[in-house]
Regions:
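Non-catalytic interface/linker regions that flank or bridge core catalytic/transmembrane domains
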Residues: 68-137
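Negatively charged, low-complexity tracts enriched in Asp/Glu with abundant Ser/Thr
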Residues: 2-10
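Acidic, low-complexity, intrinsically disordered interaction modules
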Residues: 18-63, 67, 74, 78
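Generic detector of N-terminal low-structure segments
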Residues: 4, 17-19, 67-70, 93
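All-alpha helical catalytic cores of prenyl diphosphate-utilizing isoprenoid enzymes
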Residues: 124-131, 144-156
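Tryptophan-centered short beta-strand motifs
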Residues: 2, 47-48, 209-213
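Divalent metal-dependent catalytic cores for phosphoryl transfer on phosphate-bearing substrates
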Residues: 139-147, 153, 160, 165-287
Length: 289
């Protein structure tokens, strides 16, 4: 029996356990059985113990998606291997990371809409996103992943975590393609949101002043609010199910939520597992606020 004092809960659907014996790791707890499930999450985002190696061919994700209906456990395993070690440091260039993102988008579209139409949807989306700053943008101005390529890294990290949650019985029936698609598109509202500049920083070691890259905010391109803006963009390219749409809409949870939205949010979380999965995976990928 785990010590409940060491549990961190989100809406009483899933838990994260921080064991005293390994202070640098998290484990997921299934609240229905009070047992430990899943693998260790290293707080250093460059290391995941579930996948034993990086993929030989990133394009294998398409085959994995096509096999999902007959062998979901294989597809989940392949997704883990393909999304393993998702820190921009693990890629020689940001182009390598963007290639993986593109491949995952194509794989999701193929499974959800069929090969011919799915590839058309993916191609339309990727043509658009390549003309934005998505692959170079930070995920925040000064908190999590606040560096060039941070938004891309964060999106891939969320995809890793959300596929891991498929191992929980409560989430095992959710379509893996839906999981990865919402993970990769949940923060599209951040495109064009951060403006780079150089700021003067005093070195603690030398006492000398130097210029470092930093970010400030631009006005929101789509002033609908975080989740709603990402949903608005995603629906321009993909025909989302209600569950997929709600997952993107409510992935910020109760953060900055007005009183009138609380009831709708709780209904969405209760009825649609993917809503909670994206919220939880997003939080697992963030190390600082």
């Amino acid at each position: 029996m785990f010590n409940k004092d060491n549990l961190w809960t989100m809406d009483q659907i899933g838990f994260v356990f921080l064991p005293d014996s390994k202070p640098d790791t998290w484990r997921i707890i299934d609240p229905t059985t009070d047992t430990e499930v899943g693998e260790y999450y290293e707080l250093d985002a460059t290391v995941y113990t579930y996948a034993d190696s990086t993929p030989d061919d990133k394009n294998e994700i398409i085959g994995a998606f096509q096999m999902f209906q007959d062998r979901p456990e294989y597809s989940v395993y392949r997704a883990h291997k393909l999304i393993h070690g998702l820190n921009t440091d693990s890629f020689s260039t940001l182009d390598d990371a963007s290639d993986l993102y593109d491949t995952l988008i194509a794989g999701c579209a193929i499974m959800l809409y069929g090969e011919e139409y799915g590839l058309k949807r993916a191609d339309s989306f990727l043509r658009w996103i390549r003309n934005t700053d998505f692959y170079q943008a930070p995920a925040s101005a000064k908190y999590h992943d606040a560096f060039e390529g941070g938004l891309l890294k964060h999106s891939l990290d969320v995809a890793y975590h959300i596929t891991d949650l498929l191992q929980l019985e409560s989430f095992s029936t959710v379509n893996i393609a839906s999981c990865i698609l919402v993970a990769l598109t949940h923060d599209l509202c951040k495109i064009g949101l951060y403006k780079p500049y150089l700021k003067n920083v005093k070195s603690e070691e030398t006492g000398q002043w130097k210029k470092e890259r930093a970010y400030t905010y631009n006005d929101a391109n789509i002033p609908l609010g975080h989740g709603a803006a990402s949903l608005y963009i995603t629906q321009k390219f993909f025909h989302l199910s209600l569950e997929e749409a709600l997952a993107i809409r409510w992935h910020m949870g109760r953060w900055n939520m007005c009183d009138g939205e609380v009831g709708e949010y709780h209904v969405a979380v209760k009825k649609y597992p993917l809503v909670y999965m994206l919220l939880f995976a997003d939080q697992l990928s963030i190390k600082e606020y």
